[in-house]
Structures are given as C-alpha cells and as structure tokens.
C-alpha cells in the first residue's frame, strides 16, 4: 500500500547519514502509489493438500516464519503453547482464545514491519532522548541545520528541497494531533505510515494530487496518470500495457466518467477499501480447530491442530519463533 512516502521514511530505508540530504527525485512511482493491504502470505492457501505454509505465515509473520524450519515438533508445540497463553493474556484472560483475540494476534504479527521502521526512526530522531520526537529534531536530522533564511543555500535546486521540507512539515502537523510540535510514538507512526490512519487520509490524497497534477487544475487527467507510469522515448510505440492502463483509468479510476480524477476518486484509487484479512484467517483457523464447536479455542484444541498454526521440521513448514516469545 503505497504512494510517495515522506522524505524521512526514504532516508531511513536508504540508510543515509543523519546529515545527508534526500534526493529530490526519491520515491516510488506508478502502481506503487496504491496502498493495498499486502497478502498475509504469498504461499497458496492449500490446506486440502496438507500445505499449511499460508496459515503459518499469517499466524507468525513471514520473517519469523522463515526462521523456524529447524524446530523439532516438540519445540514448536512448546513455543506455540506460550503464544496461546500470551494471546489470552492480551485479551480477557479467561483461559480461552476468542475470535477477536486470534484476529488481534494475526493483525499484530502483520504490523511488525511498521513497528520496526518506527523504532528505527525513533532511535535516530529522538536526539535528546526525552521520549518524543520534535519537529525541529526531525527536520534538522533529515535536512541539516540551517540558520533562518539560509535554508538550502548550499545545494542545487534549493526550491525543490524547500517544497519537500514544507510537505514533510505539513504531514507532521497533521500527524501531531495535539498540536504541541512533539510526536509521540503513535504520532510518528502516523507521519511515517499515514495510510494506516483514517485522520491522515486527506494528506495522502493531497500528496498524490500534487505529484500527478502537472497543470495544477486540481484534477488528474489521463495523460498525467499515464505520465506517472510511463515515459516514452522519441519514436517509441506505446506498449500494450500502457493502453490497458488508459482503459483502466476510464473504466475503474474515473468513477463519475467526467474524464479526470478528483480528490475522492484519487482516494478510492490509492486507498481502496480493504478486506479484513486477519479476520478472514482467524475465522479459518477457528473453524478448522474448534473441535467442540463452541466458537472459541482452548489451548488443547490449538495444540491438537498445532501443525496448521506453526509446523516444524517434520512438516517441512516449521515456522514458529526463534525470537524470544516476548518479541512477538
């Protein structure tokens, strides 16, 4: 799920130095703008043939799942038991795992990449270690220290950098819900991953419009849409896939058929309604493991179907937790 991310996030991903300035041309383009929920796993959902890799990756997260092919069945079951205890403690602690608790666990594992990126940002940008990230801290670490009125005097294309700075500040102000110019961890998460927060939806749409609306009429025309995907060489025939994109624009992007995209249509495109994948998988695991059909799972029921949840060397899909269980 993506559009052009903030300069700060690009900086983190590229591992620039604290004073290194970002490229004005940085950022993904084209179809990468669309913020769609990533699948819980790229593996086929093929339980009928004993392939539980999809379920393992959905339950544990893909990165952790890869680490556990070497576990014995006994190790897998023991560690799964600890996960079951933790799922219940995170909920109502009644000794059972409800559908809501199972869904919350799966959603938690799937958000690990977001938590990791925020932790990296936090460690880098909370320079005074006061437990908050101020706009001044973030700005200076990202763009460098400048005296007032001298911003970017030492770089080419200073105007582009000024626009980037203004854009990041605007996003920060929207993420900073209490308006104190100091980001809590939740507010920094909204800054880095605005697609995850309903109150940030308008800023994602505004940034996308600014990127694509070259004639500044407030809309995305079909040629502006195509220009973000494809740049033709002189004399080059337009590829078939570009023609397909034009048709996609007319048939599926331009909802009211007026020939261009307004803000609402841009939002529908880059932030489409998403299926609750963790809930779908939680329902599946509950259905397959709830032997007494009481609508909840006991620890015994989960361990009785342990190879669907985690596996081991014995199944060739072992995937639980070489991380300490408190990290999951």
UniProtKB/Swiss-Prot annotation:
One of its GO terms (biological process) is regulation of phosphatidylinositol 3-kinase/protein kinase B signal transduction. Keywords: Calcium, Chaperone, Endoplasmic reticulum, Glycoprotein, Metal-binding, Protein transport, Repeat, Signal, Transport. Residues 1-20 form the signal peptide. Glycans are attached at residue 140. It comes from the Eukaryota. It holds the Pfam family EF-hand_5. Residues 75-112, 113-148, 163-198, 200-235, 241-276, 277-312 form the EF-hand domain. InterPro entries: EF-hand-dom_pair, EF_Hand_1_Ca_BS, EF_hand_dom. Ca(2+) 2 binds at residues 126, 128, 130, 132, 137. Probable molecular chaperone assisting protein biosynthesis and transport in the endoplasmic reticulum. Required for the proper biosynthesis and transport of pulmonary surfactant-associated protein A/SP-A, pulmonary surfactant-associated protein D/SP-D and the lipid transporter ABCA3. By regulating both the proper expression and the degradation through the endoplasmic reticulum-associated protein degradation pathway of these proteins plays a crucial role in pulmonary surfactant homeostasis. Has an anti-fibrotic activity by negatively regulating the secretion of type I and type III collagens. This is Reticulocalbin-3. It comes from Homo sapiens. The gene is RCN3.
């Amino acid at each position: 799920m993506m559009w052009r991310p903030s300069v700060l996030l690009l900086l983190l991903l590229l591992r620039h130095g604290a004073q290194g300035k970002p490229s004005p041309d940085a950022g993904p383009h084209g179809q990468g703008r669309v913020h769609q929920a990533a699948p819980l796993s790229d593996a086929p959902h093929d339980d009928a043939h004993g392939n539980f890799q999809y379920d393992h990756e959905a339950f544990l997260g893909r990165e952790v799942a890869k680490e556990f092919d070497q576990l014995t069945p006994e190790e897998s079951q023991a560690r799964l038991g600890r996960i079951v205890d933790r799922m219940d403690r995170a909920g109502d602690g009644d000794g059972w795992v409800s559908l809501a608790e199972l869904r919350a666990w799966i959603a938690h594992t799937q958000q690990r990449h977001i938590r990791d990126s925020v932790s990296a940002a936090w460690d880098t940008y909370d320079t005074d270690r006061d437990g908050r990230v101020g706009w001044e801290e973030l700005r200076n670490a990202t763009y460098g220290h400048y005296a007032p009125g001298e911003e970017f005097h030492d770089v080419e294309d200073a105007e582009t950098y000024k626009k980037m700075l203004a854009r990041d500040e605007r996003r920060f102000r929207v993420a900073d819900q209490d308006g104190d110019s100091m980001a809590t961890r939740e507010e920094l998460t909204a800054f880095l991953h605005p697609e995850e927060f309903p109150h940030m939806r308008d800023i994602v749409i505004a940034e996308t419009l600014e990127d694509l609306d070259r004639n500044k009429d407030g809309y995305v025309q079909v040629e502006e849409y195509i220009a973000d995907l494809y740049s033709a060489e002189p004399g080059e025939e337009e590829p078939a896939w570009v023609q397909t994109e034009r048709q996609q624009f007319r048939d599926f992007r331009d909802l009211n058929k007026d020939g261009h995209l307004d803000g609402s249509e841009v939002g529908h495109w880059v932030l489409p309604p998403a299926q609750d994948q963790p809930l779908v998988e939680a329902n599946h695991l509950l259905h397959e493991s709830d032997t007494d059909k009481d609508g909840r799972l006991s620890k015994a029921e989960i361990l009785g179907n342990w190879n669907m949840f985690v596996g081991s060397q014995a199944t060739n899909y072992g995937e639980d937790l070489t991380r300490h269980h408190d990290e999951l």
